UniProtKB/Swiss-Prot annotation:
Catalytic activity: a 2'-deoxycytidine in DNA + S-adenosyl-L-methionine = a 5-methyl-2'-deoxycytidine in DNA + S-adenosyl-L-homocysteine + H(+)
Enzyme Commission numbers on file: 2.1.1.37
Family: Belongs to the class I-like SAM-binding methyltransferase superfamily. C5-methyltransferase family.
Gene3D superfamilies reported in the protein's UniProt record: DNA Methylase, subunit A, domain 2, Vaccinia Virus protein VP39
The name this protein goes by in its record: Type II methyltransferase M.BanI
Name of encoding gene: banIM
Organism this protein belongs to: Aneurinibacillus aneurinilyticus
Length: 428
């Protein structure tokens, strides 16, 4: 039997690869009869790997060949925690209704939709309920799973929702929602894996001999050495950001705007740790504090000299006789050094190029190939030749391994509903 499928919002083809792998396990042939992707650079990568050019804007595709299965990772931005939660009010938010149109007009047997975890809680859950209701109105039974890539042998903390539907039947699944460890520290302790494979870590995806172009600059390495000396492996798991919180390195510790004394560093660290306390107000990012308020937690006899110096260097600003650190995300080559013995934070299109690792005591950025491995792409997958586009595309993509396992589970437990009396190979 040949399964004909449509690949909408195809990106670089991550969902397709997972789907085709799952079908192959059951010795099922597949044929993509239509793919659609609006991003031209993503289309270039898709064409390199699948030898076909996706069609463009879904709004302009009015007719489809006959097909059995719809794949659609409709765009994340409207529902993502990483961006503004605009939802259906945003133009991109209405793209779900294009999915609805395709299902209504073509009535395929089944579908897989993928989206960000924010879809579950968006608008207090009403957005997801709306989506499921619309799908059920079309005659589809619907199930969904909230899954973390890190529990599928892929060392990335990436929680996504997978919505599955079968025409006339609610999908039966053995997989259950599992969001995995909340962060890399808990993952390191819990070592979660849903399958027989041992749990994966960042060191498993590192290239042996990455190009020198990914090595951090001498200037940046020099700044880092002010904090860790020559033992750069101490950077494992650290982020570079001017906010409070564990495992953070700040601009004043690196001397970005000028070297700071130990007292100045201690003062700024105390200031960001204390300024959000309720006794000083409820402003989310911390209130500017008076000299008197500062003395309640940092009563140094040279406090005024320290403050004057930090004002001159630009680490501190004065607002009506109150003081606040000049905070923000720093435009460094790397904003987070991954712990090789744990998992990566979630790859995103905007900052995949700024994730780093220390390998053989050398700080560097992770490579596009390593990003691809964090998404479960095979090493023979051809990446875009421009690194900037490759990082963006991989940050926007899906984790291939999760799609593969979800589709395997769907096929395994819904043979009659999907394939009638046909006997599938390798069904347990």
């Amino acid at each position: 039997m040949k399964i004909k499928f449509v690949d909408l919002f195809a990106g670089i083809g991550g969902i397709r690869i997972g789907f085709e792998r799952a079908a192959k396990r059951f010795e099922l042939e597949t044929e993509c009869v239509l793919s659609s992707e609006i991003d031209k650079k993503a289309c270039e990568t898709y064409a390199l790997n699948f030898k076909e050019e996706p069609q463009g804007d879904i709004h302009e595709i009015t007719s489809f060949p006959e097909f059995d299965f719809l794949l659609a990772g409709f765009p994340c931005q409207p529902f993502s925690y990483a961006g503004k939660q605009q939802g259906f009010g945003d133009t991109r938010g209405t793209l779900f209704f294009e999915v609805e149109r395709v299902l209504r007009d073509n009535r395929p047997k089944a579908f897989l939709l993928e989206n960000v975890r924010g879809l579950v809680t968006h608008d207090k859950g009403r957005t997801l309920k709306t989506i499921i209701s619309k799908l059920e109105e079309l005659g589809y039974g619907v199930s969904y799973l909230l899954l973390n890539s890190s529990t599928f042998g892929v060392p990335q903390n990436r929680v996504r929702i997978y919505i599955l539907g079968i025409l006339g039947s609610k999908p039966k699944l053995t997989l259950t929602s599992n969001v995995g460890a909340a962060d890399s520290h808990k993952y390191k302790n819990e070592q979660i894996s849903l399958f027989d494979e041992s749990y994966a870590t960042v060191k498993d995806i590192l290239e042996d001999s990455p190009s020198e172009k990914y090595r951090c600059s001498d200037e940046f390495i020099g700044q880092l050495s002010k904090v860790v000396g020559n033992n750069f492996e101490l950077l494992h798991g650290y982020r570079l950001i001017d906010y409070r919180g564990g495992n953070s390195i700040h601009s004043w510790e690196l001397g970005i705007k000028g070297d700071c004394t130990k007292e100045e560093i201690e003062f700024l660290n105390q200031l960001i740790a204390n300024r959000r306390k309720k006794i000083y107000g409820t402003h989310q990012d911390g209130k500017a504090l008076t000299l008197e308020q500062i003395r309640t937690f940092y009563n140094h006899d040279q406090l005024e000299v320290i403050i004057k110096s930090l004002l001159q260097k630009g680490y501190l600003r004065e607002e009506e006789n109150k003081f606040n650190p000049v905070c923000g995300n720093m435009s460094f080559e790397v904003f987070k050094f991954l712990d090789p013995d744990s998992i990566s934070i979630t790859l995103t299109s905007s900052d995949a190029h700024k994730l780093g690792v220390v390998q053989n005591n050398v700080p560097r950025r992770i490579t596009p190939r390593e990003c691809a491995r964090l998404q479960g792409f095979p090493d023979d997958f051809i990446l875009h030749s421009n690194d900037n586009f490759a990082y963006k595309q991989l940050g926007n993509s899906v984790t291939v391994k999760v799609v593969e396992k979800v589709i395997e589970d769907l096929f395994q437990n819904n043979v009659n509903e999907l394939f009638g009396q046909m006997k599938l190979a390798n069904v347990v």
